[in-house]
Amino acid sequence: MSNERDTSRTPTPDPAEHNAFFPSPYSLSQYTSAKTDFDGADYPTPYKGGKKVLMIGTDERYILMQNASMFSTGNHPVEMLLPMYHLDKAGFEFDVATLSGNPVKLEMWAMPGEDEAVKSIYAKYLPKLKAPRKLADLLEQAVADDSPYAAVFVPGGHGVLAGIPHSREVKRLLNAFLAKDRYIITLCHGPACLLAPAVEEKPEDYPFKGYEICVFPDALDTGANLEIGYMPGPLPWLVGENLQKLGVKILNKGITGQVHRDRKLLTGDSPLASNNLGKLAAKTLLEAFAR
């Protein structure tokens, strides 16, 4: 019989799906908290123009792991909501889209229940999270020369691996944003979206080759995340490894809250970077679009 410590590191069964699991109680005690490091969002001269930010969320909760288990995941709420809070306070409204138009899936076990900033922005955008636009339906508008979007934001959480990196719509959107000098904001596992422009293309033509980014370290997904029961098995593929194969340079080795800007690409290393990335994104967009 397992002792309590061993049991606490065992992933928790998710009864909604066959052989599916939430993170273990022990891993959640290490990785989640009731409050974030949010320390204010002071933007005395917010943007008052018409440009918005398009947030692409994941509409799939389950990732099939190498051992045939299912990881019950989604978007990480802090990674989504803290950057949204900063940008919203800076005057940039959000539209929300998923690949299918089905609701955004959130890792509610990571929601910081005592964090008023996160809770308030969640309440504000909950209707859009529950009834997002289908990305294909707004794609023509989004990539147009007169696009209403100043930036696209792809938050993290392992659920991002379930379609976004292989999406032709995401490929077209990111290619258009690069070509038209718009901003791309992403963190943790969200940079998996940067793989989309490589779909059905030659590696030597990859548009993010040579870019420097922050991203969640593969070493944690192959090490600690398995050892403490955060995931029920090895991921089907690794984000950093695949980006590096295409010529992307990863700056961080651990997770410290590091953020980085390379041209119009803004990235962060983990949930710990959520507040920092929100500040960087708000400052960057305000400087770019100040009137």
From Swiss-Prot:
Source organism of the structure: Pseudomonas aeruginosa (strain ATCC 15692 / DSM 22644 / CIP 104116 / JCM 14847 / LMG 12228 / 1C / PRS 101 / PAO1)
GO BP: any one term: DNA repair
Family, per entry: Belongs to the peptidase C56 family. HchA subfamily.
Main location: cytoplasm
E.C. no: 3.1.2.-, 3.5.1.-, 3.5.1.124
Name of the protein in question: Protein/nucleic acid deglycase HchA
InterPro entries, sorted: Class_I_gatase-like, DJ-1/PfpI, HchA, Prot/Nucl_acid_deglycase
Catalytic reaction equation(s): N(omega)-(1-hydroxy-2-oxopropyl)-L-arginyl-[protein] + H2O = lactate + L-arginyl-[protein] + H(+); N(6)-(1-hydroxy-2-oxopropyl)-L-lysyl-[protein] + H2O = lactate + L-lysyl-[protein] + H(+); S-(1-hydroxy-2-oxopropyl)-L-cysteinyl-[protein] + H2O = lactate + L-cysteinyl-[protein] + H(+); N(omega)-(1-hydroxy-2-oxoethyl)-L-arginyl-[protein] + H2O = L-arginyl-[protein] + glycolate + H(+)
Localization per Swiss-Prot or TrEMBL: Cytoplasm
